[in-house]
C-alpha cells in the first residue's frame, strides 16, 4: 500500500510588530520589500549616498540614514574606470589614492603590508608620487630598514609627511623622502637616536650582536647624513643620545623641507623663513 504525503511549504509572513525596515538609497522601505529582492545598488544609489554625506545639515531627520560602522570606518569611493561609487574601508581608499599611513609600531607583519602596497603602486604607475604619512613611534630595526630600502628602490617618487610624531626609525623614514616633498605639521615632533638592542646569551653571541648593531648604526647615520646634508661627524655626535626636533628645528637640520600650515592659521602663524609655508 502506497501512502502519499502532500505537504505545502508556506513562507513565513512578516509580522508588523517586528518593525523591520530596509533602506533603498536614503528612504525607508516597508517590509514587503523583501518579497521583490534587493534592488541593484548602482551608480545612482552611491551618488545619492555620497551627496548626502557631503551636504549633511546635522538636523535630526527620520528619513536620513547615517552610516556609522563599528571598527574600521568605511567611506564612499568612486571607481574611475567604471564611474561607480562603492563603500570601502578608509585604508583601502587611501591606498587607491597612493597614500600610505604608518601610524603604529613597525613590526614584520605591518612592514610586509607596507612593502607589498608600495611595490603594487609602483607597478601600476611609476610616474606618480606615493605619499607616506607618519605618526608613530618607529619600530623594529629590520622591518623598518626593509621599508627604507624599498623606498629607495622604487621608480615612483615617495613624499613623506609627519602629522604628529615621528620617533626613532619613523623619523629616519621621514628624512628619506624625496627632496622638496618632505613635510611636517606645525606641532609635529621628531626624535632620533642610536639604534638599541637587547642581546642575551654567551659572551661571543653578545659580542657578535654588538658588532652587527654597530654596523647598522653606521649605515643609518651615514644615510641620514646624505638625506639631511649634515656632516656625518655631527650626526654621530648628535645622535649618541636622544635628539628631539620641533618642526622649525627639523627644517634647519634638513629632516624636512616645508611646514604645512592649514589655511585657517596660515596668516596668523609665525614664519621664520620662506621655506615654511603651505605645502
UniProtKB/Swiss-Prot annotation:
The protein's induction, as recorded, is:
Repressed in darkness.
One GO term in the molecular function aspect is:
ATP-dependent peptidase activity
BP-aspect Gene Ontology terms: chloroplast organization; proteolysis
Q: Which InterPro entries match?
A: ClpP, ClpP/crotonase-like_dom_sf, ClpP/TepA
Q: In which tissues is it expressed?
A: Expressed at least in leaves and roots.
Which key words tag this protein in UniProt?
Chloroplast, Plastid, Transit peptide
Task: Identify the domain of life.
Answer: Eukaryota
Keyword Chloroplast listed: yes
Indicate where this protein resides in the cell: Plastid, Chloroplast
Q: Where is the transit peptide?
A: 1-54
Q: What happens when the gene is disrupted?
A: Embryo lethal. Delayed embryogenesis and albino embryos, with seedling development blocked in the cotyledon stage. Under heterotrophic growth conditions, seedlings develop into small albino to virescent seedlings.
GO CC terms: chloroplast; chloroplast envelope; chloroplast stroma; chloroplast thylakoid; chloroplastic endopeptidase Clp complex; extracellular region
Its job: Required for chloroplast development and integrity. Involved in the regulation of plastoglobules formation.
Q: How does the annotation summarize its subunit structure?
A: Component of the chloroplastic Clp protease core complex which consist of at least 16 proteins: CLPP4 (3 copies), CLPP5 (3 copies), CLPR4 (2 copies), ClpP1 (1 copy), CLPP6 (1 copy), CLPR2 (1 copy), CLPT1 (1 copy), CLPT2 (1 copy) and 3 copies of CLPP3 and/or CLPR1 and/or CLPR3. The core complex is organized in two heptameric rings, one containing CLPP3,4,5,6 in a 1:2:3:1 ratio and the other CLPP1 and CLPR1,2,3,4 in a 3:1:1:1:1 ratio.
Family note:
Belongs to the peptidase S14 family.
User: What is this protein's record name?
Assistant: ATP-dependent Clp protease proteolytic subunit-related protein 2, chloroplastic
Natural source organism: Arabidopsis thaliana
Amino acid at each position: 500500500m502506497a501512502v502519499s504525503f502532500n505537504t505545502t511549504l508556506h513562507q513565513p509572513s512578516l509580522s508588523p510588530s517586528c518593525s523591520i525596515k530596509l533602506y533603498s538609497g536614503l528612504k525607508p522601505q516597508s517590509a514587503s520589500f523583501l518579497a521583490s529582492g534587493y534592488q541593484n545598488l548602482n551608480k545612482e544609489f552611491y551618488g545619492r549616498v555620497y551627496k548626502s554625506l557631503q551636504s549633511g545639515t546635522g538636523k535630526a531627520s527620520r528619513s536620513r540614514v547615517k552610516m556609522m560602522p563599528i571598527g574600521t570606518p568605511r567611506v564612499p569611493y568612486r571607481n574611475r574606470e567604471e564611474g561607480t561609487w562603492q563603500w570601502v574601508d578608509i585604508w583601502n581608499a587611501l591606498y587607491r589614492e597612493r597614500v600610505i599611513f604608518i601610524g603604529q609600531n613597525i613590526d614584520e607583519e605591518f612592514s610586509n603590508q607596507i612593502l607589498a602596497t608600495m611595490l603594487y603602486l609602483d607597478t601600476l604607475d611609476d610616474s606618480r608620487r606615493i605619499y607616506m604619512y607618519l605618526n608613530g613611534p618607529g619600530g623594529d630595526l629590520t622591518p623598518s630598514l626593509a621599508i627604507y630600502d624599498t623606498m629607495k628602490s622604487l621608480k615612483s617618487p615617495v613624499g613623506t609627511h609627519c602629522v604628529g610624531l615621528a620617533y626613532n626609525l619613523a623619523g629616519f623614514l621621514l628624512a628619506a623622502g624625496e627632496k622638496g616633498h618632505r613635510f611636517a605639521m606645525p606641532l609635529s615632533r621628531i626624535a632620533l637616536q642610536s639604534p638599541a638592542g637587547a642581546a642575551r646569551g654567551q659572551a661571543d653571541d653578545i659580542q657578535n650582536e654588538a658588532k652587527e648593531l654597530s654596523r647598522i648604526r653606521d649605515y643609518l647615520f651615514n644615510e641620514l647624513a646624505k638625506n639631511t646634508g649634515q656632516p656625518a661627524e655631527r650626526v654621530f655626535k648628535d645622535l649618541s643620545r636622544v635628539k628631539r626636533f620641533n618642526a622649525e628645528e627639523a627644517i634647519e637640520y634638513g629632516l624636512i623641507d616645508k611646514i604645512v600650515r592649514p589655511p585657517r592659521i596660515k596668516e596668523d602663524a609665525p614664519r621664520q623663513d620662506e621655506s615654511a609655508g603651505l605645502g
